[in-house]
Design a protein with these regions (language model features):
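A structural signal for short, well-ordered beta-strand segments and their strand-loop junctions
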Residues: 49, 70, 74-78, 112-119
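Metal-dependent nuclease catalytic regions and adjoining charged, substrate-binding loops involved
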Residues: 59, 105-211
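Metal-dependent nuclease catalytic cores that hydrolyze phosphodiester bonds in DNA/RNA
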Residues: 1-72, 86-88, 133-141
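Short beta-strand-loop-alpha-helix junction that forms the active-site gateway
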Residues: 78-90
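Flexible, glycine- and charge-enriched loops at secondary-structure boundaries
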Residues: 88-95, 157
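Active-site catalytic microenvironments for nucleophilic, acid-base chemistry
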Residues: 9-13, 104-109
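An active-site-proximal "capping" alpha-helix that borders the catalytic cofactor pocket
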Residues: 95-107
């Protein structure tokens, strides 16, 4: 999407990267050692990997993933989302799962045990940020800015591989089943949000029709 394209473009333009690092106070020697998507890393290099796809074969399947950014051993991902998804942390487990699979695919590059999620809020409101009060211990405060970053713990490589194997085993067991015998997808698999059912009463049923 546009967000990822813009982020990739900003990192793969070497002049922009050098200028930004210098503005951030990096020494000229450090800036010179920054290498974007290097095929090999020499001593003293500071490798940064942007939008790289990797795949791995397991149990007859190919697992593939393309991360946004890996820097200093940490995987980073950009998310354009609503403020309430952030407040309620409704995608927390998905982010952990996604980051864990990236690490499983790239254990040589992703060496840290956390994923950094960089949020860009599509519905942020300064008025909401001033009045919102934290309602529950497991929720985040309404973000003070239109962007925010949060760190999440990753699974171990063993946990990730076990999850992948279990999912592949389930898929394999369904391959020969007739359509009517297949299990229905869960709400999570269908991306159905909780408590989103809405019912409306219309005094005039014709008002529900569209031209």
């Amino acid at each position: 999407n546009a967000l990822h394209t813009a982020c990739e473009a900003s990192w793969t333009d070497s002049k922009n990267v050098a200028a930004a690092l210098k503005l951030a106070g990096a020494a000229d020697s450090a800036v010179a050692n920054v290498k974007i998507n290097p095929e090999t890393v020499k001593e003293g290099d500071i490798p940064i990997y942007v939008e790289q796809r990797c795949e791995k074969e397991i149990d007859g399947f190919i697992i593939s993933g393309k991360y946004d950014l890996v820097m200093d051993g940490t995987v980073h991902d950009y998310k354009s989302t609503s403020t309430w998804a952030y407040v309620n942390q409704s995608n927390r487990e998905d982010y952990i799962k996604q980051g864990s699979i990236y690490k499983w695919l790239n254990p040589d590059k992703i060496t840290n045990s956390t994923v950094q999620i960089h949020y860009l809020f599509t519905d942020w409101s300064i008025a909401e940020s001033r009045k919102f009060k934290k309602e529950s211990y497991n929720k985040e405060e309404y973000p003070a800015l239109k962007v925010a970053t949060k760190s999440y713990p990753l699974w171990s490589l063993e946990e990730t591989e076990s999850w992948i194997k279990n999912r592949l085993a389930a898929i394999t067991s369904y391959l020969e089943l007739p359509q009517e015998s297949l299990p229905e997808c869960s709400n999570d698999e269908l991306w159905v949000r909780k408590n989103t059912e809405k019912y409306k009463y219309y005094a005039n049923a014709d008002s529900t029709h569209r031209a």
